[in-house]
């Protein structure tokens, strides 16, 4: 009899939960329509994988790419709609969040063609790879719109778990396994640190979890200047610093970059930065509104450390991927300037603009590295010597992307940094901007050092890898080369006409 009553209660509770979930999805589902498209793409991939013995690989790529393109289209159709909070306060939709979602989708869309030939050559499992990329993208998109502490914790964990699996995708490679273990252990530690900071916020605000309600709760409890908020700020900054690869939480980055498959590195190098930047912008600007001076100081210190250490250590690297890892640590230091400046002086607009350019510059560079690695089997910087004599197109593409990363005019990277530094200067961040300018000049040195190697024509300096290099045909249908062309064009032309991009970014108030 007791068992029968308990069983009935369980059925009633389950029915209530199901009906509540159905009600939320029915009335609030339109707010996550772009995310639903990706979920539908995931289901299709799983169905094809479970029902087909001979997997039609082109269809798998087509479904993944189409899901991303359709999701981008849904975002564009929703542009300029009124900001809305849905799912009982868990999710917020506005133009600012949608720009970051667009950037994540753009990264994923460009990374799919970069992976095709690499996966075919290395005989990696294609379905699982695409599933992890789609799921990581989904986690990043939910993070951009997250409006409460639970969603802010769960969404990046979804992204992180897929990142761990992707970084260790080549299971027979010892370096890949080592990178995965380091990434997993340090990622777990950073997540614990982050959630500990959230617990201090939750307690100090009187039990609130929504971002804006936390601010109201801190006012009601008079805890907005308490030691508890300072503790929360320190722990959350450390956790976000890991996600952004900010010094001194950057140690995992070079090992993961070197040990992971190159298309995975290309994907993680941009999507993780975009998603973590969206998280940092929201978490610092809303719950820590009353502690702006404190978190400004913390981020300034971390940005200075990242710009100096990242660019100094990059000079000494012999691996191209490790060099780009340290370069990315320096690059995120520049992005932090926009976060510190905030919305009042155009800081967020300059950050978004530079992030868009960074996506094209970085993915273009990785496309060149993937092509060179597939044709030579090496990642050593010295082995790029004389590449121009064998493949001028690849050498020029790599040179343009590196020069844009360094910030040389008239490329996109120069105008992106110029606008970012100008906004910082107007906001009074003179020392931070000065460090940014000096480290940008320093970064040009190691980029030019690589370009000098590319263009060398002396036979004694050309390595056997380049001498035996497979020259690609003039007309190539290689998907990596197509992505590379798109990224190279995006790294050069937008710098000349970037006003529309800045206008769109400024039209998305926080």
From Swiss-Prot:
The chain crosses the membrane at residues 24-44, 57-77, 99-119, 124-144, 149-169, 183-203, 227-247, 295-315, 323-343, 354-374, 395-415, 428-448, 484-504. The keyword Transmembrane helix applies. It is an enzyme of class 7 (translocase). It is a multi-pass membrane protein. Keywords: Chloroplast, Membrane, NAD, NADP, Plastid, Plastoquinone, Quinone, Thylakoid, Translocase, Transmembrane, Transmembrane helix, Transport. GO terms for cellular component: chloroplast thylakoid membrane. It catalyses: a plastoquinone + NADH + (n+1) H(+)(in) = a plastoquinol + NAD(+) + n H(+)(out); a plastoquinone + NADPH + (n+1) H(+)(in) = a plastoquinol + NADP(+) + n H(+)(out). InterPro entries: NADH-Q_OxRdtase_suN/2, ND/Mrp_TM, Ndh2_N. It is found in: Plastid, Chloroplast thylakoid membrane. One of its GO terms (biological process) is photosynthesis, light reaction. It holds the Pfam family Ndh2_N. GO terms for molecular function: NADH dehydrogenase (ubiquinone) activity; quinone binding. Its EC number is 7.1.1.-. NDH is composed of at least 16 different subunits, 5 of which are encoded in the nucleus. NDH shuttles electrons from NAD(P)H:plastoquinone, via FMN and iron-sulfur (Fe-S) centers, to quinones in the photosynthetic chain and possibly in a chloroplast respiratory chain. The immediate electron acceptor for the enzyme in this species is believed to be plastoquinone. Couples the redox reaction to proton translocation, and thus conserves the redox energy in a proton gradient. Belongs to the complex I subunit 2 family. This is NAD(P)H-quinone oxidoreductase subunit 2, chloroplastic. It comes from Brassica napus (Rape).
């Amino acid at each position: 009899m007791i068992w029968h009553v308990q069983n009935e209660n369980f059925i009633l509770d389950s029915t209530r939960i199901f009906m509540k979930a159905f009600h939320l999805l029915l009335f609030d589902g339109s707010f996550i329509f772009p995310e639903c498209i990706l979920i539908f793409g995931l289901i299709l991939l799983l169905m094809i994988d479970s029902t087909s013995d001979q997997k039609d690989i082109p269809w798998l790529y087509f479904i993944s790419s189409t899901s991303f393109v359709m999701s981008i289209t849904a975002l564009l159709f929703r542009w300029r709609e009124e900001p809305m909070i849905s799912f009982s306060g868990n999710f917020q939709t506005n133009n600012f969040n949608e720009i970051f979602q667009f950037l994540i989708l753009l990264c994923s869309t460009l990374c799919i063609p970069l992976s095709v030939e690499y996966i075919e050559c290395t005989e990696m499992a294609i379905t699982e790879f695409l599933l992890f990329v789609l799921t990581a993208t989904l986690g990043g998109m939910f993070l951009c719109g997250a409006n409460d502490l639970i969603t802010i914790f769960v969404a990046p964990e979804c992204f992180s778990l897929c990142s761990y699996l992707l970084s260790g995708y080549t299971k027979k490679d010892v370096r890949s396994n080592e990178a995965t273990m380091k990434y997993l252990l340090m990622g777990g530690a950073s997540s614990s640190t982050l959630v500990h900071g959230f617990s201090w916020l939750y307690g100090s605000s009187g039990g609130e979890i929504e971002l804006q309600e936390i601010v109201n709760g801190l006012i009601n409890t008079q805890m907005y200047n308490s030691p508890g908020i300072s503790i929360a700020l320190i722990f959350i900054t450390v956790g976000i610093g890991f996600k952004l690869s900010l010094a001194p939480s950057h140690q995992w980055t070079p090992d993961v970059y070197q040990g992971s498959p190159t298309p995975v590195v290309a994907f993680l190098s941009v999507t993780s930065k975009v998603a973590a930047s969206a998280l940092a912008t929201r978490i610092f600007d809303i719950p820590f509104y009353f502690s702006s001076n404190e978190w400004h100081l913390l981020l300034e210190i971390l940005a200075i450390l990242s710009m100096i250490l990242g660019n100094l250590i990059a000079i000494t690297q012999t691996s191209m991927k490790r060099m780009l890892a340290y370069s990315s640590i320096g690059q995120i230091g520049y992005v932090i300037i926009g976060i510190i400046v905030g919305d009042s002086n155009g800081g967020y607009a300059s950050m978004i603009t530079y992030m868009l350019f960074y996506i094209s510059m970085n993915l273009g560079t990785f496309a060149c590295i993937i092509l060179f690695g597939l044709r030579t089997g090496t990642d050593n910087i010295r082995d790029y010597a004389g590449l121009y004599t064998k493949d001028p197109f690849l050498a020029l593409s790599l040179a343009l992307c590196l020069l844009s990363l360094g910030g040389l005019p008239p490329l996109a990277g120069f105008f992106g940094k110029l606008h970012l530094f100008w906004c910082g200067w107007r906001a009074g961040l003179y020392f931070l901007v000065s460090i940014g300018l000096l480290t940008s000049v320093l970064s040009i040195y190691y980029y030019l050092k690589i370009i000098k190697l590319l263009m060398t024509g002396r036979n004694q300096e050309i390595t056997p890898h380049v001498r035996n290099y497979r020259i690609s045909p003039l007309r190539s249908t290689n998907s990596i080369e197509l992505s590379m062309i798109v990224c190279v064009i995006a790294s050069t032309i937008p710098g000349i006409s970037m006003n529309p991009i800045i206008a769109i970014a400024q039209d998305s108030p926080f």
